[in-house]
A protein has these predicted regions:
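Crotonase-fold acyl-CoA enzyme core
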Residues: 30-146, 169, 173-178, 182-186, ...
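Glycine- (often His-adjacent) and acidic-residue-rich active-site loop
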Residues: 1-31, 47, 77, 160
């Protein structure tokens, strides 16, 4: 994703540009975070500007050495938008995030892997296949449990330990009514692999 269309942004007033960002990017990022299924980003090429934010909003990322993230905002005189600062700083910490955002340079796949910005580093031709294979692997797990785990992790980003314990306990209730929990416990007791159905 190459980011925002600068020909469109350039024709907007500052107030209209602000409204465009809030009205368009906020709902997309909210959907990324509230979806109770993991999102795997297959980044084949350079994800720039808000495209980098969308990439980091994915729960998991697959990249190649040639893939890159580019916080290009600074290169045209802007600061980050679309939640890009929130997403990057939580991945790599304040100082490294500031370095990347003010540097305006491509962060290649290998560096992304070292920084924890991508989960898997593969050959370019394998990106889609690896992402699909990972998605299939995740689909065989208890989807209610995965949804709970994703929400727990997101909640923990902005809350203390004791609040997180309470949140986890409340979220866990949904799993207690699931067929997957019954299957998981039965499979464990019978020393066999569980056959989860996502129910």
């Amino acid at each position: 994703c190459s980011g925002a269309d600068l020909t469109t942004i350039g024709t907007l007033s500052p107030e209209d540009s602000r409204d465009y960002i809030i009205d368009n990017y906020k709902p997309i990022l909210n959907n990324f975070l509230s979806l109770r299924k993991p999102i795997i980003g297959a980044i084949n090429g350079t994800a720039a500007g808000v495209g980098a934010a969308f990439a980091l909003a994915c729960d998991f990322r697959v990249m190649s050495k040639e893939s890159a993230l580019l916080y290009a905002f600074i290169n045209i005189g802007l600061g980050p938008d679309g939640g890009a600062s929130w997403l990057l700083s939580r991945q790599v910490g304040y100082s490294k995030a500031l370095e990347i955002a003010t540097g305006g340079k491509r962060v290649l796949g290998e560096e992304c892997f070292k920084l924890g910005l991508t989960n898997k580093l593969v050959e370019s031709k394998e990106i889609i296949d690896v992402a699909k294979s990972w998605a299939i692997e995740l689909s065989k797990k208890p989807t209610i449990g995965i949804g709970i785990t994703k929400q727990d992790m997101i909640f923990s980003l902005n809350n203390d330990l004791l609040s997180t314990i309470e949140f986890e306990a409340k979220e866990q209730v949904a799993a207690f009514y699931s067929e997957d929990l019954k299957e998981g416990v039965t499979a464990f007791l019978e020393k066999r692999k569980a056959n989860f159905k996502g129910k």
